[in-house]
Design a protein with these regions (language model features):
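Short glycine-rich, flexible loops that bind phosphorylated cofactors or substrates
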Residues: 83
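Short coil/turn segments at secondary-structure boundaries
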Residues: 21-29, 49
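Short alpha-helix capping/helix-loop boundary micro-motifs
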Residues: 57-63
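Non-catalytic DNA-recognition/assembly elements of restriction-modification systems
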Residues: 1-18, 34
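A generic structural signal for residues embedded in beta-strands
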Residues: 75-76
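Basic, amphipathic alpha-helical recognition segments used for DNA target recognition
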Residues: 6-13, 41-50, 67-70, 86-90, ...
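Short beta-strand/loop turn elements enriched in aromatics
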Residues: 30-46
Length: 125
């Protein structure tokens, strides 16, 4: 069996998160799961199910965040940097993330989770 090397951009789409205005109270306490890097550091888990706050459809529509389908990788890119989780529910994130939506025909989410965690120092550089 021959293994093929890929660049991350060849096996995944990478999306930034975004934050709805916190001045607009009706952007929050909705039904859309929303993650912050602090949520990942507080949970200290391989899997992400729920953050400390949800956003509303209005909040979602008001910013450039993307809905990340379940079973992909959330990677914090701001303090704290280099935290990873596999989202077990559809969710969106704040701007402190690079969200990695994998081509599952080419790679496995669990493999990529551990691969990225192992290479976190190279990613941070």
């Amino acid at each position: 069996m021959e293994l093929k090397k890929y660049k991350l951009g060849e096996i995944a789409e990478i999306y930034n998160g975004s934050t709805p205005s916190t001045k607009e109270f009706d952007n929050y306490d909705g039904n859309i799961v929303w993650a912050t890097p602090k949520d990942l550091s507080d949970q200290n888990s391989k899997y992400f199910y729920q953050g400390s706050r949800n956003i509303t459809q209005k909040g979602f529509d008001s910013c450039s965040t993307q809905l990340i389908p379940a079973n992909n990788i959330l990677m914090s890119s701001r303090a704290p940097i280099g935290l990873f989780a596999i989202n077990k529910v559809d969710c969106c994130t704040n701007q402190g993330f690079k969200n990695i939506v994998l081509d599952k025909k080419i790679t496995d989410v669990d493999f990529m989770y551990y691969f990225l965690k192992y290479h976190v120092k190279e990613i941070e550089a």
